[in-house]
Structure formats: structure tokens, C-alpha cells
């Protein structure tokens, strides 16, 4: 009797742990097996070939991962290799938003990709139908419709105006603006800011022999379409710099073109062309002037707001006045003398205040 009971118990256990139906094995759940995470998920979609630019987009990546570690979140960051691949990512994003209306997992989608504005605005209404999905659309001055997501704009006009006003003090009078394309508002407003600051005569720098510095400024676009021009090939960058060096020897290059600008600046350093090249988004130790955009801090701020009971504001502007952009100087003894001679403290303050005022005027 005892052996029969033991047999029945063993048989029952076998049925519970490894019964088969149509050849498929059904396993008893393992209590030690990790369960799928229900932590909030942050998904980031970049522009074409954006990551690896060692400036703006890499700063976004850094800010996202710091926030993920701080708040115990999950992240998925996607950098497409073509416009079409980026569009496919966005299509998947909107499909997921529609398909997860009953899901309790919170999801934040961050889009920092120029060139998809019309498509994003046409479909953003889907976020209004999903209480647990939110959209943060970066670098647009125009808010989304109510309930369809949040927008963040970090204008570069003010800080570029300030940098443009400072540059002549270091006897950089031949300036070339390299702009990614003529359609993306962010880089073109930055170019406008630099132009306005550079051409404003706050002071009159002179050469050692007494002649007044004459200013010359030219703008050149790398590509024609929105979203393009931010990551040109190495060979293209080399040929471009070779061409520019024949015309702008000892000139100053202001690269408003993402990763393309980093390639140009690196080539300036190793080829000894004599060209200066402004640092953009991050501090470049080899350059006199760098213009910083603290986008890593900004996305961290937005994620913290998203997790808060109040949520993210509908639209935020974080620029020079708010301390999210700034000019960083790296001056040796000679440059320090020039700076103090032409731009004393009271004039520095005036330039800074003018830059803030003009940036705010462009935001209205």
C-alpha cells in the first residue's frame, strides 16, 4: 500500500513538472527565476548616425543613463543609420503607444531627431489616448497640442551672440560658419546669434602695428535637407578643410554641424593648418573659446519631472538666462591680456545681458 501511494505521488509530480501536450514540455515555474521588470522604461530615438559625435548627442546619452541609474529605470537608446530607419523607429513607437493603452508600465519616449517634425506632430495625438505613455520632443520652439506630449527647447542664439562678440578680442577676424543645413532652426538660429554678436562693434581691437581689425564673416552649408550634414565622411571633412585652408588660412571656423564639426576640429589640430575652431556643446581644451549646451542636465531634469506627481511641463525653454548654455574660455597669458584689455568686466556684463535680452526676443 505504501509503495503504491509513493508511486501515485511520484506520478503526480511528473505530471505537474513535465507533462507534454503535442510534444511540448510544460515546466513548473521556478520561484528563483527573475521576473520581467516593471520599472519605467525610457526609450530614446536619435537622428541619423547621431551617437558617437562626442558632443550634443553623446551628452544626451550620458544624461539619460545617469537618470536611469539615479531613479532605477530601464532605457533603450536607438541611433538609426538612415532617415528611413529612423522613420521605422518612430512608426514602431507610435504603434507601441497604441497597443499598450491597458499596460500599467510607464513609458517615456524621447525624440531628438531633426527631420521628422511633421510626422511626429501628425501622430502625437496617440499619446493623449495612453495614460502611461509620455513624449518628450527635444529642440523645438513650438509646443505640441495639449495632452500630446512635452517639448524642450534650448536656444543657442544668446550664447552664440556672446561668443561672437568675444571672438574679435583674440584677433580672430576671418570667421567661417559651417552650418549643417539651411532648414534646421536650431543651428541656423545659432548661426544668426554668432553673426549678430560678431558684427556688433562693442570695441575696436587692433593689430600690434596699430591697424584696426577688419571683420569678415561667411556662412557655408554642408547639406541641403533637414537632418543632414551632421556626420560627413572623414574623407569629405579632409577635402573640405583642405579647400578652406587655401582661403581661410589662420581663419576661425565655427562648426554648427554636430559630429561633422568634431571631425573638422580634429583635422585642424593634426594638420596644423593654422585655423582655429570653436568648441561646440562641450569644452575643447585646445581651443580658446567653447560654447556649452548642458543638454545632459536638461534631459535629467525632464526625467525627474516626468516621475514627479506634477509631471513634465508642456513646454520648457532652457537657455543662457537659465544657465543651460554658457561660454567657456581657455586663455593663456597672452589671450588673458587681450581679453582684459578689450572686454573689461563692465563690458562683459553688458554683452551677457544683451545676449539674454536678444535671445528672449527671438523666443517670442
For each predicted feature, which ranges?
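Extracytoplasmic "Venus flytrap"
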Residues: 42-63, 67, 76-90, 187
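Periplasmic-binding protein-like
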Residues: 44, 100-115, 134-138, 247-258, ...
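C-terminal motif of bacterial Sec signal peptides marking the signal peptidase cleavage site
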Residues: 15-18
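Structural motif
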Residues: 75-97, 220-243
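Hinge/cleft segment of the Venus flytrap/periplasmic-binding protein
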Residues: 301-364
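Flexible loop/hinge segments that line or gate small-molecule binding clefts
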Residues: 128-154, 283-285
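An alpha-beta-alpha
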Residues: 64, 159-216, 314-341
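Hydrophobic alpha-helical segments within soluble ligand-binding/sensing domains
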Residues: 151-175, 291-313
